[in-house]
Amino acid sequence: MLFKYWVVCLLLFILFIQARASSFMPAVTNYLAKDYEAGYQNWACAQGSNGEMYFGNSQGLLVYDGYRWTLHKVPGNHIVRSVYVKEDRIYVGAFEEFGYFKYSEAGTLRYHSLSKFLKNFPMENNEIWNIVELDGRIYFQSFSAWFSYDGKMVHAFRNRQQQPLYFYTQNGHIYTQMIDEDFYEFDGKDFLHLFPRSQVNDDNVVALLPDGDDSFLMVTENNGLFRYNGDITPWKTDIDAELKKQRVNRAVMTNDSIFMIGTVLNGIYAIDRKGHCLWHFNLDNRLDNNTVLGLFCDKDNNVWAALDDGIAYIHHNSPVMLLTPANHETKLGMVYDIAHRGDCFYLATNQGLYEYHQVTENLRLLPHTEGQNWYVKDIDGQLFAGNNAHTLLIGEKGNVSVISNTNSSTCLIKCTLYGEEILLESSYANLRIYKKKNGQWTFSHVIDGFIAPVMHLEVDQSGVIWASHMYQGVYKIVLSDDLSAVKGVRHISHLGSEYIIGPIQVMKMRGRIVFSSPNGFYTYDDITRQIIPFQKLNAILPYIRNAHSVVSVTNDRFWLSGSHEYVLVEYAEGEYIVKQRILIELFDSPCIENYNNVFVDNDVVYFNLNNGIASYSKNTDSLSPTLESALSLSSVTASSSDKKEKRLPLSGNVELESNYRDLLFSVSLPHYNKLSVHFHYVLQGGQGMALTSDLKEPEIRYGSLDYGEYTFQAEAYNDLGQKIGEVEYHFAIARPFYLSYYAFALYLIVLTALVYFFSKWRANRAMEKKRKEYEAEQVQQNIKMREQEHLITLQQQQLLEAELSAKSKDLASMALGVFAKNEVLEKLRTVVQESLVKGQYGRKNLESLLKLINENIETQEFWDVFQN
């Protein structure tokens, strides 16, 4: 009997664990230290009025707006253990330090210490673990003291007989769990005893949860939950036994009254107001760490968990829920198709065909289905599945039978050919037909004349079969009237004028054949019998290429599956409209390209994932962020030509020096659901400039701006193109000095001086030129005068020479005459002298004659004169 008892207990436990782990649960986004670039441990969470999230991290205050993580240190670089936000202040507590951060005019967080204002109270070894507010006062609680701040003064309190373990606020009161002591209410001055700890099994109350105006729920560390309304009674849950073993550390209630309980040893539990467990996150399914140090429910009703290693974001308010295997040992693989029958879902995966029971939440692999399964489909109450080996028929109890004469199956559709309703099946080799017999679909025959691997089939209104080749192009097939053979086949590798490398996806929308390729959507025109671009669809879906499936919700609503997203399209008044976009990255479960399909079941849409499926309630129109988080300008940074940077005020009239011409604008739109948001930026001003940009990033940089006044505008749009926020900023860049009015005045003075000096220089130059011309003229005149004088001199010389020549001739003649005369006279004188000597003449007469001769004979002086 004892053995049977333990076996039953073990089986129940296993069933419980399977059911608990294999349920639809919210998506979880995990952030690790490498993502936010700070310490591993996170102790507390809070949210600002602008939607930003703040975390007490082992390295300081961590800030996140959905795009950027920033870390802000506190004095001493200590761990931030507690965070509390009131209006524009972010209060923090750390080791021997507490105070608040506040944004400056330039959007920079600055720390203001409050503990430094304490008088006559040493902060030695006091570490602030909790921050609460009551009646406008902020209380900072350590394990040995508490401190109050009224906005002006800081006061310290200590009671060595009563040392608080936790401060909590509930119903407008502060309650306190004392260390190894009882439970109290704190009125701001004194502690009022409420009950002894023995009434909660000698345990510590670690959290309080709302439970009406006059009562609340107390969450204990090791003994579950208790209701307090003056009396104390246990509050039963489905997980009391587990909570007693997992060491509860934190708890919070969501806006829709779901209790989140965080443990030290086994992650997070969610229970409703009746104590029923909704789901459990731990290291085995969604969380990256089991130790929960803080919990917080944000404005969007999603839950943040501060973990011993990282941060977890639970998409509690999302209409998307995920189903994943019970534990790490079960691997679904990639889910290719989903079917629903009764209480069970059937999942065709590349590992096999799985059955998921909604009531027991049990997930099992059906026998003989191992390997690649391409589809599972309920057709008129019969459940078919196709895999690499056979076509399968699934019975009511999950029994599997193989349909004979089938060797593989890739697609099975219900259609009408030549007035007869049939099932048409494709495979790796041939096409097959099923017909109804005794109200059941049974295999009929293989179609002759066609052998090719086909991935998907569609049949148009004229009975033409369009078959997507598994690797290249698409086939257009016409069957014989008796459906026994192929009458005509054409392989198509072009869409329009474009040659398509690879398979061409074929789909059906509103009875119309649609093709998808890397170049967009095409359709078959029944009138022209040509494949033409599907302009209306391409116009609204420019971001989807190579869509691989279409699933009809109604005749006018369709889900299209692309490689990176799912899109809900509606046809209304002759136009197609995008109603919803869901990015695959929302699921943190990458899919194999071109196999992420959709299954629609009443009001719920299911998405195929890798190792799971996601459900989405169609009652929710949009996953897009609302104006709960407004678009704001988070920073404006200006850079100068010499590489200096400065943050600018975010409001007022801002004017920059002329050398600050490069600006970086950062905007903030806090949202955390991985939704498709894009930003439209416009910068106008300067010298008639207008720049427009559309980006995914929440920042934009402008460089080398001209001087002048500018207006910067940023707008945020959701995935449907709806504007969800806008912000405007005005600034001016001063004229550079060389273009300033002072510079122009200086330029005028300089120009005037230049004109003056130029005029003067020009006048002087003209005078100098005239002087030089005059001097040159004088020189020329002098030269001419000298030439004339020289000519005159030459003429005079010539005249003198002529006269001289004439006179020379005369002189020569005279000289010759004189010479001749002298010779005669000399001879005569000689004769006379001889006669005189001889005494032939009278001496007196001769002397007289000789005297006369001597007087007429030229002397030596005469000859000298003649020679000269």
Predicted ranges, named:
Residues 40, 268, 446, 776, ...:
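Short, flexible segments with low predicted structural confidence
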Residues 1-733, 740-741, 745, 749-752, ...:
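Carboxylate-rich, polar loop motifs that coordinate divalent cations or form catalytic acidic clusters
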